[in-house]
């Protein structure tokens, strides 16, 4: 009976969260540069809660707003940039779960659905072709491997140039798509601040929290911001290195990083980012955990990385009063 009560309460809370959402498009009409997109967005829902679990083939970017109850609101807001290797949004873990956690602590959460790679149906394997071995690393034309495929460990972070980890410079399509996602994040920052009074948000307390590829998008939006309205008040990246060359902004933007030491390339990339920030005289905090590589799940409480959210929240309150 107790378990049933907990389950019902969880479902009711999830339903309340969904009913309280606002979804706003970032652009009027088609997003600039996506005029030729013909793919259809795909959405997967959690069969238990009915909440969105995963999104792919996004070409119409938007923000989804999750606001805390007015009696808890602190005025702080976090724009959540989910991970998924630019192929999908890990919306359930990186947005829905994180938004609920932040709302409970009085922080507004805004899920950013930035543009992704178009997903095409898998092509049939040519007759006689050998299956690709598990763990084999893809190569670009010409046989050269992109930086993220060099399999660097954290001790080799100095081999990364200005934190640029992925995509490779000669991956024109990857660079173009990354810039579209970065543009989406900059527009999202402006849009959130334009609604600050309506949503009970302090426009000076709005920042990014990105996961994996979403961390790269958040970093890109920060280092390419051209106006005060686009510059975040803080930047946090969770196992997400930069996807472009980094020129640390002159504006003060405190940086928070969390990753796992054995998450090869990623750990090296974010350490390089940390050093860039410190060399520029900026505030930066980094947590590198010893447990196995991969994403931080919601049930990691028994692992060293299970404390990352509390560390982020303490850092946020210390940095943004």
Specify the residue positions occupied by each region the protein language model found.
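The feature captures the conserved acid-bearing segment of alpha/beta-hydrolase catalytic domains
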Residues: 230-288
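Primarily recognizes the serine-hydrolase "nucleophile elbow" in alpha/beta-hydrolase
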Residues: 176-252
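Gly/Ser-rich "nucleophile elbow"/oxyanion-hole loop immediately N-terminal to the catalytic nucleophile
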Residues: 130-133, 137-208
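Short amphipathic alpha-helix adjacent to the substrate-entry channel of hydrolases
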Residues: 92-111, 275
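N-terminal cap/lid segment of alpha/beta-hydrolase-fold proteins
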Residues: 21-72, 104, 179
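Active-site glycine-rich loops that stabilize anionic/oxyanionic intermediates
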Residues: 82-87, 261-262
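C-terminal catalytic histidine-bearing segment of alpha/beta-hydrolase fold enzymes
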Residues: 283-321
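Short beta-strand element of the alpha/beta-hydrolase
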Residues: 74-83
